[in-house]
Every structure is written in structure tokens, then in C-alpha cells.
């Protein structure tokens, strides 16, 4: 990357055809999954008029995703990764077709929606793990920060476009259009992915999958560096669960419906700015220290968010959280990929992604519990400032991560 620029260099898309193929596939996949994410809750709500049933579908899919990440990590370290990616994407698309067919029936089956949600959650996360494990081989470890930032932008852009497109489709054609286009998009992603080179895994002894997964847990616990990265990632994800308090906080600020949308947009916007301005981040000599400081800063932004006297100041705090958490996440991703042995990349990426799923759920549950005992303002502030205290303690305790130094990479991407 350009040492003179703070802006993200997109030249990796030009110089690395394999990464460009992954970029296209990922963007199409995010939009497709976004269409699905809009359609499933709406269809279940229309069929059952029960928010509990909607929540159950989210819980089941989340559980399937967690299992898929664990299984995918083992498979990605055992089998040729391109085959795992293609198999997972194709199988996931079959589930989308099933949802489309079910929605066209005179009486769609609720059980089928739940079962296909399990199917799609499992296979979607299976492919994600293999793709993450393959990224260092596709771009080179010296370009991982740049690849991570481009990927973050892809996710944010797709996450903005897909709900809007999904809402338009629901209004004009019903859920069948969402499911059908999600299936079509998933199969289209196979075209660029077929152009990827073979992605063999390093030779390693065959062992029971549970033993292989246990070995990854042991490595995580035995490595202060990798373990510290995973712990920080989980805490940042927990902090992002503050969004469950937006509706209640919006009432205290007397926000309109249109203004509430700004609360939800603030963190993604801040994260996008963080990715766009990450041009020199890969050249930092002490990434561990920057990660720790940016993480503590993001917690402080959450603590200040709810006690702001006006909602505009709260939005600024959320955007600041998005920016700082993006810096922390990019450094987590890069250090995890560069400091993990090649033969464990699949399992470690699976565990790291799984902590994002579980961290968000735990954070939402804790905020819900706090909300039962105190006001929404107090709940958000207590959680944010509590995480600040934990973050400061980790700044002292995680000495190896704090002192970690690296030689700035020399990228050939531009």
C-alpha cells in the first residue's frame, strides 16, 4: 500500500485476479443473503403473527451457523479449500430454492422454513470459514490488511443495498422474488469462484474431527497473542449489541422514525470510514498496542453515547465506535491470519468468526438483563464504561500483545 496515503488502496483488485473473483462473489453473496434476511422474518410474521416465532428462526439459524463454523474450520484444514467453498455455496443455493418453492405453495410450511434456515445457516458459514482460511494464499500475507479493509467495505456496502432492495421486492412481488433472486445470486457466485486456483492444505496427520477442534482450542488458550486477539474481538462484538437499546433511547431523545434510522446507520458508516482510511495501518510497527487502545476507545464511545444530551451527539459517538472498532477488527484479522500456522488457519478462522456470533448474542442478553433493572440510558452507559474498565485491565494484562512488534510489509499490490 502507498505509505504516503491514509486512504485505502484498491489496486489489489487489479493485481490479484483470484482476490477480484472472491470480491465479486462475496458482494453478490452478501446482497443475496440480505434479500433472504428481509424475507424470512416477514414471511414468518405474516404466517404466525408471532414475534416469538420470528425470534426462534433467528436463534435456530444462529445455532446452525455456529456449528457450521466449527465443522467448516476442521474441513478447511483437511480438504482442498476451493472444493469446500464451491460445495458449501452450491448446497446453500439449493436451500434457497427450497424456500422459494415453499413460498409458492398455497399453504407454505412453517416447519420447512425452520429446517431450511438450519440448512442454509450451516452451509453458508461452512463456506465462509474455508474462504477466510484461503485468503492468505490468494493475496499473500503482506497484503492481508488491504484485503481485509476491502472486504469490510464490501460487507458494509452490500449490507446497505440488500435491505433496501429486499424491501422493494417484498412490496412489488412478495417473498418468492426475494428467495428466487437469493438462489440465483448464490449460484452466480460459483462462476467467479470456479476461476480460483487450487487451494491445497499443508500435509498433516489425519485425526478425529473433535480432536482436531480441541487442538485448535488448546492453541488458542496456549497463545497469549492469539488468545488476546480473540478475547478483544468478542468484547468488541458484545459492545456492538447496544443497538438493541436504540428504540428505547430514541424515545427519550424524542426522535422521529426517519431519525431513528440514523442510529442504525451510524456504526456501519463509521466502520466504512475506518476501512477507507486504513491505508497506513498495515505499516504500523506496534499493531497490538493500536488494537488495544482503539478497542478501549470504542468502549468509551459506547459509554458516552447514551448520556449525550441530544441525539446528534449520540450518532457521532456511534460513528466513532464504528471507526475505532473497524481499526481494531482489521488488526485482529491481519494478526490472526499472519500469526496462525497454515495448518490451523481453517479452525482458527472458524473460532474467530464464531466468537462474533456468540459475542453479539451474549451482549444482547446482558443488555436485556440490565434493561430489566435500570433505564435504557443507564444500561448503555454501564455496559460501555464497564467494558472500558475491562479493556484497561486487558491493556495491562495482555503484555505480549501490547509489546508485539512487526516489520511493516512491503506490498506488491501497487
From Swiss-Prot:
Gene that this sequence comes from: entS
Transmembrane segments: 22-42, 56-76, 84-104, 110-130, 157-177, 179-199, 219-239, 257-277, 288-307, 314-336, 357-377, 379-399
Entries under HAMAP family matching the protein: MFS_EntS (MF_01436)
Disulfide bonds: none
PROSITE patterns on file: MFS (PS50850)
Cytoplasmic topological domain residue ranges: 1-21, 77-83, 131-156, 200-218, 278-287, 337-356, 400-414
Main localisation: membrane
Matching CDD domains: MFS_MefA_like (cd06173)
Keyword Membrane: yes
Claim: Lipid metabolism is one of the keywords in the record: no
SUPFAM superfamilies given in the database record: MFS general substrate transporter
Entry function: Component of an export pathway for enterobactin.
Record's bilayer topology term: Multi-pass membrane protein
Name of the protein in its database record: Enterobactin exporter EntS
GO MF term list: enterobactin transmembrane transporter activity
InterPro entries registered for this protein in UniProt: Enterobactin_exp_EntS, MFS_dom, MFS_trans_sf, TM_effector
Family: Belongs to the major facilitator superfamily. EntS (TC 2.A.1.38) family.
GO cellular component: plasma membrane
Amino acid at each position: 500500500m502507498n505509505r504516503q496515503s491514509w486512504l485505502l488502496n484498491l489496486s489489489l483488485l487489479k493485481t490479484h485476479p483470484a482476490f477480484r473473483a472472491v470480491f465479486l462473489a462475496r458482494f453478490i453473496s452478501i446482497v443475496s443473503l440480505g434479500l433472504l434476511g428481509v424475507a424470512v422474518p416477514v414471511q414468518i410474521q405474516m404466517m404466525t403473527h408471532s414475534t416469538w416465532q420470528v425470534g426462534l428462526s433467528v436463534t435456530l439459524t444462529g445455532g446452525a451457523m455456529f456449528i457450521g463454523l466449527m465443522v467448516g474450520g476442521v474441513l478447511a484444514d483437511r480438504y482442498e479449500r476451493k472444493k469446500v467453498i464451491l460445495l458449501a455455496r452450491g448446497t446453500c443455493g439449493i436451500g434457497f430454492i427450497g424456500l422459494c418453492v415453499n413460498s409458492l405453495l398455497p399453504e407454505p410450511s412453517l416447519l420447512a422454513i425452520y429446517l431450511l434456515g438450519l440448512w442454509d445457516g450451516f452451509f453458508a458459514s461452512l463456506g465462509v470459514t474455508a474462504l477466510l482460511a484461503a485468503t492468505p494464499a490468494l493475496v499473500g500475507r503482506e497484503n492481508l490488511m488491504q484485503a481485509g479493509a476491502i472486504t469490510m467495505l464490501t460487507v458494509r456496502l452490500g449490507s446497505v443495498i440488500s435491505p433496501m432492495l429486499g424491501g422493494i421486492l417484498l412490496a412489488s412481488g412478495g417473498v418468492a422474488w426475494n428467495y428466487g433472486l437469493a438462489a440465483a445470486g448464490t449460484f452466480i457466485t460459483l462462476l467467479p469462484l470456479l476461476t480460483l486456483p487450487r487451494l491445497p492444505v499443508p500435509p498433516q496427520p489425519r485425526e478425529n474431527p473433535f480432536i482436531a477442534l480441541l487442538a485448535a482450542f488448546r492453541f488458542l488458550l496456549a497463545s497469549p497473542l492469539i488468545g488476546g486477539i480473540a478475547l478483544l474481538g468478542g468484547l468488541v462484538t458484545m459492545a456492538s449489541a447496544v443497538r438493541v437499546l436504540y428504540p428505547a433511547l430514541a424515545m427519550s431523545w424524542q426522535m422521529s422514525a426517519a431519525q431513528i434510522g440514523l442510529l442504525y446507520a451510524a456504526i456501519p458508516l463509521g466502520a466504512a470510514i475506518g476501512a477507507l482510511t486504513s491505508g497506513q495501518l498495515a505499516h504500523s510497527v506496534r499493531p497490538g498496542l493500536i488494537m488495544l487502545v482503539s478497542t478501549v476507545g470504542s468502549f468509551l464511545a459506547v459509554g458516552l453515547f447514551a448520556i449525550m444530551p441530544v441525539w446528534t451527539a449520540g450518532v457521532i459517538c456511534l460513528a466513532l465506535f464504528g471507526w475505532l472498532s473497524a481499526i481494531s477488527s482489521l488488526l485482529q484479522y491481519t494478526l490472526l491470519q499472519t500469526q496462525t500456522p497454515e495448518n490451523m488457519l481453517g479452525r482458527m478462522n472458524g473460532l474467530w468468526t464464531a466468537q462474533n456470533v456468540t459475542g453479539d448474542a451474549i451482549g444482547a442478553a446482558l443488555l436485556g438483563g440490565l434493561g430489566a433493572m435500570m433505564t435504557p440510558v443507564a444500561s448503555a452507559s454501564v455496559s460501555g464504561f464497564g467494558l472500558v474498565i475491562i479493556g484497561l485491565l486487558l491493556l495491562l494484562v495482555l503484555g505480549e500483545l501490547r509489546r508485539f512488534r512487526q516489520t511493516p510489509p512491503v506490498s506488491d499490490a501497487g
